[in-house]
Amino acid sequence: MALSALSTLQAAELPITKNSPIPDFQNRTQDVAPYDFDAPPQGLFRTITTAEGFDEELGLHRTHEIVPVKPTTLFSPDTQAVFIVFYLHQHYQGFQVFGRCYPEAVAGLDPTVVIGQDAMHIALEDDSGYLTLSPPKGAWKPGRYKVEIHVGEQVNEMSLMGTMRFTIVAEKR
């Protein structure tokens, strides 16, 4: 009985805090930058880059690590493939990374039509990967291309993570 009286006495002595408005606990809009889906993806991706190729190396924990070879955003029209190589933060389930290529500023091509795409399944133990984009109809036309990066089980309006860009430069004569 004496123990419960003591705890009641201590509880009664606690100060009462004022009711704070909910905005005091929320992020202020001026402190939060909006996410840009028209820029390289962030969040899940530690790094992501376009490259002329990739190598597979043995990682720190004896895992397969995909590393870019000759990272660049400028390619020649005779390039056999453009690679998008990425490193991921830790994740807790498998998923797919999709790349959908559009001709953003290429003469004679509709910028709304997908001209190439690739997907890679990422297993739980994977921390890197790559996408391969082959030229449409055998050769790249000079101009700027954009690649939408999607993550999930399928491509839809909610799976877009960001956009990568590369340029095919005209050959020097």
Regions found by a protein language model. Give the residues of each.
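Contiguous beta-strand segments within globular domains
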Residues: 59-93
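Solvent-exposed serine/threonine-rich low-complexity stretches and specific carbohydrate-binding patches
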Residues: 111-125
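Short beta-strand elements
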Residues: 157-173
